[in-house]
Amino acid sequence: MYSVRDLIGDAGKYAQNHERVLKQLADMGFTAVEAANYGDGKLYGVAPEQFKADVEAAGMKVMSSHVTRNLNDEELKSKDFTEALKWWDQCIDAHKRAGMQYMVIPWCSVPKTLADLQTICDYYNQVGKKVAAAGMKLGYHSHSHEFQKVEGKVMEDYMIEHTDPNYLFFQMDVYWAVRGQVSPVAYFKKYPGRFTLLHIKDDSEIGQSGMVGFDAIFNNFDKAGAKGWVLELEHASTPDILKGMKESIDYIKNAKFVKASYNK
């Protein structure tokens, strides 16, 4: 739903446009949504149960949500997650009531030291344990900066190697991985099974730039451990984001490699 943020990205826009926009997405062939607006126990300004009902009324399912409460400098220094974990309690409850399968942390800045990165990993493990206890799974969404090094270690690699696979999966954004000058498929092979969800994304509409090898990515879903994928269109080539979304999903629906991957 981040892709259509200009139409339904806050409570006011959601109230005004959600029925039309969600139905249009469903009619294009989208089957599930990933939310990107949580606050104070609500999604897009409505109760979790109402959000679930809205999505299902359009003919789709609620799958995942981008949400986080990052550690502040004092918490990072003290390694005291008490207040942060209290915040997660309400958040987890709301997402469970909304019928979510996955909760995904969308961002973490590059820390200055490996010690700080280890603290972040420890924090994510604790949050993930809470999420798992509620019957959902916690993920981390990578951009390009995670492929930078922290004290000689690639941030993405360190996070994968120092988080518990029972409590944290990784949602690779294949476009940002390419922008970070790495191969998504190489990561699937290096860390098989850790990429439960993927963001299928391009520079604009899917398949236009030629930057991303979508055929190899879809044909290695099993190696990645992917159980689902989210089409994201951060910027369309025209002002009409829904037109761009339709062009993108049509590309995916008509691609032979996508059909082959689902016929395995």
Q: How does the language model describe each region?
A:
Residues 1-3, 8-12, 17-29, 151-172, ...:
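Histidine-acidic metal/acid-base catalytic patches
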Residues 16, 46, 79, 112-115, ...:
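Short coil/turn linker and secondary-structure boundary residues
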Residues 12, 42, 78, 82, ...:
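Charge-dense, low-complexity intrinsically disordered segments
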Residues 1-101, 250-264:
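N-terminal pre-domain/capping segments
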Residues 22-27, 43-64, 87-99, 122-133, ...:
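Acidic (Asp/Glu)-rich catalytic clusters
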